[in-house]
């Protein structure tokens, strides 16, 4: 069964959670443009809400956008398992939540600062932009820095 859409009826840019989403892409793939939402949780949210995965993001109605927006803010309310969420067992209150956008960035910065206060090597390496998980750094992972070759004068 082939699902086709009419380009004349598509809203080309959809705004959800302060992010512009491409309206021509299918809903789960379009939702991955929101920072903190991956394909796994986007697909799970669409399936739990009963939204057709073949539908384009620009074809969504206002009620569908509202339901998706609410589900992104609180995935547990629609039955998404805790293992899908990106902030499990919070250090302060022990809750599990799903962070998106600037809340995710702020939480990452707080984690790095807390680690630097405790003198953790991982936090220092994250802060400087080096590899964290034991990879070698002599030849790979040189993005962002120019090694350059000095010219003979």
Swiss-Prot record:
It holds the Pfam family Ribosomal_S13. Gene3D superfamilies: 1.10.8.50, 30s ribosomal protein s13, domain 2. One of its GO terms (molecular function) is structural constituent of ribosome. Residues 134-153 are annotated as: Disordered. Disulfide bonds: none annotated. SUPFAM superfamilies: S13-like H2TH domain. It is found in: Cytoplasm. PROSITE patterns: RIBOSOMAL_S13_2. InterPro entries: Rbsml_uS13_C, Ribosomal_uS13, Ribosomal_uS13-like_H2TH. GO terms for cellular component: cytosol; small ribosomal subunit. The keyword Transcription does not apply. Keywords: Cytoplasm, Ribonucleoprotein, Ribosomal protein, RNA-binding, rRNA-binding. GO terms for biological process: translation. Belongs to the universal ribosomal protein uS13 family. Located at the top of the head of the 40S subunit, it contacts several helices of the 18S rRNA. This is Small ribosomal subunit protein uS13. It comes from Encephalitozoon cuniculi (strain GB-M1) (Microsporidian parasite). The lineage of its organism: Eukaryota, Fungi, Fungi incertae sedis, Microsporidia, Unikaryonidae. The gene is RPS18.
């Amino acid at each position: 069964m082939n699902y086709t859409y009419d380009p004349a009826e598509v809203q080309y840019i959809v705004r959800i959670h302060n992010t512009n989403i491409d309206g021509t892409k299918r809903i789960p793939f379009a939702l991955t443009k929101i920072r903190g939402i991956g394909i796994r949780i986007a697909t799970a949210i669409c399936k739990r809400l009963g939204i057709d995965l073949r539908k384009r993001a620009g074809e969504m109605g206002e009620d569908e956008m509202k339901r998706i927006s609410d589900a992104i803010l609180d995935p547990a309310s629609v039955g998404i398992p805790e293992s899908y969420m990106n902030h499990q067992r919070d250090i302060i209150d022990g809750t599990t939540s799903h962070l998106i956008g600037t809340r995710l960035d702020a939480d990452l910065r707080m984690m790095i600062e807390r680690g630097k206060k405790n003198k953790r090597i991982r936090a220092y390496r994250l802060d400087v932009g080096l590899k964290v998980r034991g990879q070698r750094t002599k030849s790979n992972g040189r993005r962002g820095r120019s090694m350059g070759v000095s010219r003979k004068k």
